[in-house]
């Protein structure tokens, strides 16, 4: 295992920023460290880098304890949100900086810099200064500079936050391809779940200093381990009494029981669109949101307001329209456990929506 973290804790005064966090990361994996602001993500990243010291706990790289090592002794590349490029240096000199500090021979230095210039798509920009580059180009320089000394671990603190949406989308795909080509273990902090889901091999979700769950994007979305993860990842509706919905009468209720229902677990439409009309219940369209490739439909069922998707290929619905609603499944949880509950009136499997 490349990285092993056990029982990591960090306080800032009375604030418990990181609370008993443990995890392993395999070599070459790209990890998305995801969570709301103040959840402890950046604190974990800075402790891995040696920029902060943990109050207690162990950090090991390839089995070696590194708690006592200085940042420059850990073999880490760090990419900051604001690029942190040297304004008075050209692209070439920015990338070469770490190699010069390590006193790499000139011929080897030039070869490595030009290799990274080519790898990051910066050919022809070697003599330009940071102010002559776009935001996306500056971030590529920052990546190249971090990779130049051939670190064993690459850490990225919200690397796309300062870049506009279109370029950010392009850089996501580019980063994924770059990491795969270089084969370096990488961890990036983000509060953007779409970014984490699209780019990462695995996601670690943090909240209030605790690691809530670690797993592949698919596993975390389909099998959330805690109510926080279930509500944080993806779009969903939270319901206090799921037993009021048709097919879930025996699911239980009470102050401790709650249900989370994702949009894809719900079908909405006119009566003739359902093969099993007896399983559906009446709803009223509250609001429609056009999302480019589909409609997001808010529908009222009794006292509950649910959200679901509707294909553009189906007849358009209108606010106030009476429709039929089928809830296929719900994610239920209480103080002791969580589980997926299927609609007990259903016979045929839930259709796959592509």
Q: Residue locations for each model-derived region?
A:
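The feature captures the beta-strand-to-loop junction immediately N-terminal to the Walker
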Residues: 34-36
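ABC ATPase nucleotide-binding domains
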Residues: 30, 69-225
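Non-catalytic connector elements of ABC transporters
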Residues: 236, 247-354
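ABC ATPase nucleotide-binding domain helices that frame the ATP-binding cleft
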Residues: 42-45, 141
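Helix-to-loop junction immediately C-terminal to a conserved catalytic motif
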Residues: 49
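Conserved ABC transporter NBD signature motif
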Residues: 57-65
């Amino acid at each position: 295992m490349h990285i092993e973290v056990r029982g990591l804790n960090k306080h800032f005064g009375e604030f418990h920023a990181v609370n008993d966090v443990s995890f392993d990361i395999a070599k070459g994996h790209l990890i998305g460290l995801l969570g709301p602001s103040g959840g402890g993500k950046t604190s974990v990243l800075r402790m891995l880098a040696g920029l902060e010291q943990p109050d207690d706990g162990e950090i090991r790289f390839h089995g070696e304890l590194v708690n006592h090592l200085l940042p420059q002794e850990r073999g880490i590349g760090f990419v900051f949100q604001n690029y942190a490029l040297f304004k008075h240096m050209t692209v070439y000199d920015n990338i070469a900086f770490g190699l010069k500090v390590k006193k790499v021979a000139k011929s080897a230095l030039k070869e490595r810099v030009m290799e990274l210039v080519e790898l990051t798509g910066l050919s022809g920009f070697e003599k330009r200064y940071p102010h002559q580059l776009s935001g996306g180009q500056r971030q590529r320089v920052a990546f190249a500079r971090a990779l130049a000394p051939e670190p064993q671990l690459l850490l990225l603190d919200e690397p796309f936050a300062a870049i506009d949406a279109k370029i950010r989308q392009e850089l996501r795909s580019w980063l994924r391809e770059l990491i795969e080509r270089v084969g370096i273990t990488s961890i990036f902090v983000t509060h953007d779940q779409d970014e984490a889901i699209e780019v990462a091999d695995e996601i670690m979700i943090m909240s209030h200093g605790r690691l809530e769950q670690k797993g592949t994007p698919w596993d975390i979305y389909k099998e959330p381990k805690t109510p926080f993860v279930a509500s944080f990842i993806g779009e969903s509706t939270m319901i206090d009494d799921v037993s009021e919905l048709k097919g879930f009468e025996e699911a239980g209720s009470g102050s401790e029981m709650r249900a989370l229902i994702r949009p894809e677990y719900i079908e909405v439409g006119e009566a003739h669109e359902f093969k099993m009309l007896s399983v559906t219940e009446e709803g009223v369209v509250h609001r429609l949101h056009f999302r480019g490739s589909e409609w997001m439909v808010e529908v009222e069922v009794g006292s509950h307001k649910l959200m679901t998707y509707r294909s553009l290929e189906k007849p358009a619905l209108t606010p106030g329209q009476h429709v039929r609603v089928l809830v296929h499944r719900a994610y239920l949880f209480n103080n002791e456990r969580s589980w997926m509950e299927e609609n007990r009136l259903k016979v045929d499997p839930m259709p796959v929506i592509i």
